[in-house]
């Protein structure tokens, strides 16, 4: 399993390409010309655009803590994408990414996944 975020991103892109050979994925590189918080991976699978914010799970770290590292700006962008009818969520590895893509292909905006869009914390900084 890849330990750094870039390794996780590469693993996700490879896995999506294997599962859906006609898919296209892009690694979104942040820059001064790009709005803050845009998810790390954009993929087009069977005509559906899916955004994935990637967090790597550090040794000894709980999944809840890893999801909690999603920044306020990243949560805001994920909410904007979902509000527009798009699919977006935070994932920790290629297995979660494939599951999220399958859910999105079934019509989900992935709103039930982290980050939450409602609740006591407003969806920011706490996993379900």
Stretch-by-stretch model annotation:
Residues 1-128:
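Catalytic phosphate/metal-binding cores of nucleic-acid and nucleotide-processing enzymes, i.e., regions
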